[in-house]
């Protein structure tokens, strides 16, 4: 009888252990992929301090790709972002802000699905497909922000920049340069807006989520742009990868 009881208790204990081991799976098995996406975004917004690193690469229609711009940074007090880019650049690449990027991914999402072959007991991996119209709107805003940064820049070796550094120099040349610079900016702005008006966007993201904490582990966003430039069809791509780390 005692042998039977011990054997039965062993089976019960084993079953309980298995249930506990699978509890993490059951925890997110009851939630849809879109719910998991939403929970990971809201979860990150509630984290007071974390670190991140990654890179952004831009590809042309010819198949050539720019050297990825690497970055790393920290977030404190939920939304105070500090970023360092490779080479000591002081500009944060557009879209790098981790929480804003995740919010955009959620906002654009038309479909989210679990990727079984990439998921395991520790993480759930989602593939998120963006709605083309929403993606075009989000990316138009991102690209306009990038263009606005360019508008505020003056080449370092220009007469205007030299005069800014040396108050004794004549202002005539800087004034002429500034006029030419503004004309070029105006022309570029019109071309840029014409490009945006024809732009279509396809974007997919891969998000790895900690199954226990429901926090993002990594994100990869792949986006393809098709548009017209000077009346000719053009295509570009952009890939941004971010890994999250709690200190």
Name these PLM-found stretches.
Residues 82-87, 155-165, 237-240:
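Short C-terminal domain-edge/linker segments immediately following a structured domain
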Residues 189-247:
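Acidic, serine/threonine-rich low-complexity disordered tracts
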Residues 129-199:
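Mixed-charge, low-complexity intrinsically disordered segments
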Residues 52-54, 124-128, 215-223:
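A short hydrophobic beta-strand element
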Residues 54-140:
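An acidic-aromatic
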Residues 11, 29-30, 94, 170, ...:
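Intrinsic-disorder-associated interaction segments
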Residues 42-50, 119-121, 198, 211-217:
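Edge/loop elements at the starts and ends of beta-strands within beta-rich repeat scaffolds
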């Amino acid at each position: 009888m005692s042998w039977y009881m011990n054997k039965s208790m062993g089976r019960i204990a084993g079953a309980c252990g298995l249930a506990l081991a699978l509890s993490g799976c059951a925890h997110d098995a009851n939630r849809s992929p879109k719910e998991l996406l939403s929970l990971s975004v809201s979860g990150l917004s509630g984290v007071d301090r974390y670190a991140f690193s990654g890179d952004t690469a831009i590809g042309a229609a010819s198949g050539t790709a720019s050297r990825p711009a690497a970055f790393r940074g920290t977030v404190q007090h939920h939304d105070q972002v500090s970023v360092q880019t490779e080479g000591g650049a002081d500009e944060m690449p557009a879209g790098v802000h981790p929480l804003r990027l995740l919010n955009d991914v959620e906002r654009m999402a038309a479909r989210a699905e679990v990727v079984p072959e990439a998921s395991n007991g520790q993480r759930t991996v989602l593939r998120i497909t963006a709605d083309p119209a929403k993606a075009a709107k989000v990316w138009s805003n991102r690209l306009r922000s990038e263009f606005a940064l360019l508008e505020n820049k003056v080449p370092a070796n220009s007469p205007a920049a030299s005069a800014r550094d040396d108050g004794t120099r004549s202002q005539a040349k800087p004034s002429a340069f500034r006029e030419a610079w503004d004309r070029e900016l105006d022309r570029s702005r019109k071309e840029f807006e014409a490009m945006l008006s024809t732009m279509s966007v396809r974007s997919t993201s891969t998000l790895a989520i900690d199954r226990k904490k429901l926090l993002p582990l990594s994100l990869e966003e792949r986006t393809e742009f098709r548009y017209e430039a000077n009346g000719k069809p053009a295509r570009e791509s952009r890939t941004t990868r971010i890994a999250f780390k709690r200190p």
